[in-house]
Amino acid sequence: TEIRANAVLWEQSISVLYRSSQIAAQSEPLETAKKRAEELGVSVLMTGNAPQRQWIRALIAPAICECAANCVRHADGTELYVFFLQKPDCTEVSLTNNGAVPKEKITEGGGLSMLRQRIEEAGGKMEVWSSPRFKLMLSLPEQEEAAHESDDR
């Protein structure tokens, strides 16, 4: 039945998101996140030069998992597009999908809220758009020390 199918999808999404929280310990977080997304039936297409710094990759990986889960759950999508842009002082990451356009403004639930907290604790910024289509934008500082400067005061 439809209810059973939706329950299975939620169970898969929760499992993928739980395992994505363990990604930071993985040797290659972006590849691990890509595999988690594929388990949900979402292909991840990356464009641009992915950051080399492991701590930045470990911050991006949960965003990929969260966006893949939301792509399936809310947009009935099958592809997640990840665009990397290296700037002198930061790495920008834009995530969009091929799913349905959100019907209303996106309200951050548990997954996006937790992601925002992780990004901001690292000194980064996160923006979410619902129009003209879903887009998650991350801006992560190039220097890890810059993310923790305010802690020293």
How does the language model describe each region?
Residues 1-43, 85:
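DHp/HisKA dimerization-phosphotransfer hairpin of two-component histidine kinases
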Residues 79-89:
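Short beta-strand/loop element within the Bergerat-fold HATPase_c
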Residues 91-99:
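Conserved DxG motif in ATP/Mg2+-binding regions
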Residues 40-65, 106:
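Conserved short strand/loop->alpha-helix "switch" segment adjacent to the catalytic nucleotide/phosphoryl-transfer site
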Residues 134-144:
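Short C-terminal beta-strand
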Residues 1, 54-78:
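Histidine-centered phosphotransfer motif of kinases
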